[in-house]
């Protein structure tokens, strides 16, 4: 017996109304993905699936696909598991066995996994080169502290500053309780 897949747009709208740390950015995530016909989204960090649903609803509308990575195998139990527009890889986002399974070209890169400075730098090094010209990298939680990081610092912000300085790039921070960093890959 096949379990029916959820109505992704309805699920997305419900999650936009539900309390979560990403709620204020869900319309933006969805909107960015809707900019690209045949959108290719690479998401690191699924957790409860709020961002995943925003991207999947856009991918369904745009004829695209979402690849998600998370270390938590419980992500296999999401209602949209089996959706033809979703590929999930369970594992460490920077392990070669995981990075090798991800698409080589993406329009939207979303990082919201481990928020330690070094891990974010490693994810940017592994995945930002896959962002196509005109594409975007979005990094959630630019305004949170992380265990093991120096007091008074925001590790995602520090990683963005370091990566962009090394690469000759610029990033912007969108306001909000948790912060969202944006890097646009120039043409």
Predicted regions: what is each one?
Residues 1-110, 114-187:
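A short alpha-helical cap/connector motif
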């Amino acid at each position: 017996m096949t379990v029916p897949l959820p109505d992704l747009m309805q699920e997305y709208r419900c999650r936009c109304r539900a309390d979560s740390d990403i709620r204020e950015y869900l319309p933006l995530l969805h909107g960015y993905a809707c900019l690209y016909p045949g959108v290719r989204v690479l998401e690191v960090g699924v957790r409860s699936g709020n961002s995943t649903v925003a991207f999947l609803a856009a991918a369904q509308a745009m004829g695209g696909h979402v690849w998600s990575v998370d270390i938590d195998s419980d992500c296999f139990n999401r209602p949209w598991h089996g959706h033809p527009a979703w590929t999930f890889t369970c594992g460490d986002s920077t392990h070669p066995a995981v990075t090798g399974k991800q698409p080589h070209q993406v329009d939207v890169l979303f990082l919201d996994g481990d928020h330690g400075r070094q891990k974010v730098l490693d994810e940017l090094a592994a995945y930002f080169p896959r962002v196509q010209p005109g594409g975007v990298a979005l990094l959630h939680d630019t305004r949170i502290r992380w265990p093991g990081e120096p007091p008074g610092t925001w590790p995602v912000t520090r990683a963005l500053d370091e990566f962009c300085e090394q690469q000759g790039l610029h990033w912007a921070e969108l306001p909000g309780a948790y912060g969202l960093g944006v890097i646009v890959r120039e043409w």
